[in-house]
Each structure stands twice: as structure tokens, then as C-alpha cells.
Amino acid sequence: MERTFVMVKPDGVQRGLVGEVIGRLERKGLKIVAMKMLWIAREMAENHYAEHREKPFFSALVDYITSGPVVAMVVEGKNAIKVVRTLVGATNPAEAAPGTIRGDFGLDVGRNVVHASDSPQSAEREISLFFSDDEIVNWEKADEDWIYEER
């Protein structure tokens, strides 16, 4: 099974959307194997968004993600990265399809409720930035045989 990183951003936490995001992930059949609420330190935020360091919006992005608590998760499932990205929707909520998290709840590209890894490499990097190995729980859902034809 593939793992990916998902984070409910400060706007999602402040608007009470944490449960909605978790519910959508779980109803899709994905499994949460790690989760915590934290207030991201500036250094961690800069590492998380390192690929945007030279872009003009970098400082504002770091300011925003450190402005309030977030909920960080490791989510597991078959094709988890692609499945989660589809559930989340386009980065710009105005372009996100109805029925996606951003399409239903996002109002602004800078306040788009949730972050999700976009590749296996970014998932691995982001998971290791936010979680130690002993914080990730390996467990089997009772309904996995009903969700996946093959595992």
C-alpha cells in the first residue's frame, strides 16, 4: 500500500473542517496511520515548502502556514497519492471540481483548506519531516478485503 502526506491547513482548522477532511478520506477507503495537531515552527515550514523558496510568494506562504495550528496525517491506501489528490481537487478552488474538498470549501488559492503530497518523492520527504517512524502505526482495517480486490 502507498502512503501519502495530508495536512489540514490553518484555515481548515479554524473553519472546523478537520472532521470533514478526515471523513472524506476514510469514506473513500483510505486508512489514517498517523495524525497530530501542531503549530508549525518557521524552520519546519521553510523546509516543507523548500521547492518554493525562490518564488515571490514564499514568505507569505510560510507566514500563513505558521499562523495557526494544522492537522498533519499520513494516509495509506492503494494509489493513495493519486486518490487523495483527486479528493482534494485543484490548487485553485475556483478551478476545483464540485465534490472535491477545495471545490466545496476552498475560497482562495492561498486559503485552500488542505495540502496533499503530489508525488512519491514529496510524500516520503513530507512524512519524514512531520513524523518519526515510531509515530506511524501499522494496522489492518477489518474491511480492507471489501475495499480492495487485490492488495
From Swiss-Prot:
Gene Ontology terms: cellular component: cytoplasm
InterPro entries named among the record's database cross-references: NDK-like_dom, NDK-like_dom_sf, Nucleoside_diP_kinase, Nucleoside_diP_kinase_AS
Keyword Kinase: yes
An example Gene Ontology biological process: UTP biosynthetic process
Positions with a binding annotation for ATP: 9, 57, 85, 91, 102, 112
Predominant localisation class: cytoplasm
Catalytic reactions of this protein: a 2'-deoxyribonucleoside 5'-diphosphate + ATP = a 2'-deoxyribonucleoside 5'-triphosphate + ADP; a ribonucleoside 5'-diphosphate + ATP = a ribonucleoside 5'-triphosphate + ADP
EC number of the protein: 2.7.4.6
Localization, UniProt: Cytoplasm
Pfam entry (one): NDK
Keywords: ATP-binding, Cytoplasm, Kinase, Magnesium, Metal-binding, Nucleotide metabolism, Nucleotide-binding, Phosphoprotein, Transferase
GO molecular function, one term: metal ion binding
Catalytic machinery residues: 115 (pros-phosphohistidine intermediate)
Keyword Plastid: no
Taxonomic superkingdom: Archaea
Cofactor: Mg(2+)
Family: Belongs to the NDK family.
NCBIfam families on file: PRK00668.1
UniProt function note: Major role in the synthesis of nucleoside triphosphates other than ATP. The ATP gamma phosphate is transferred to the NDP beta phosphate via a ping-pong mechanism, using a phosphorylated active-site intermediate.
PANTHER family tied to this protein: NUCLEOSIDE DIPHOSPHATE KINASE
The protein's name: Nucleoside diphosphate kinase
Recorded name of the encoding gene: ndk
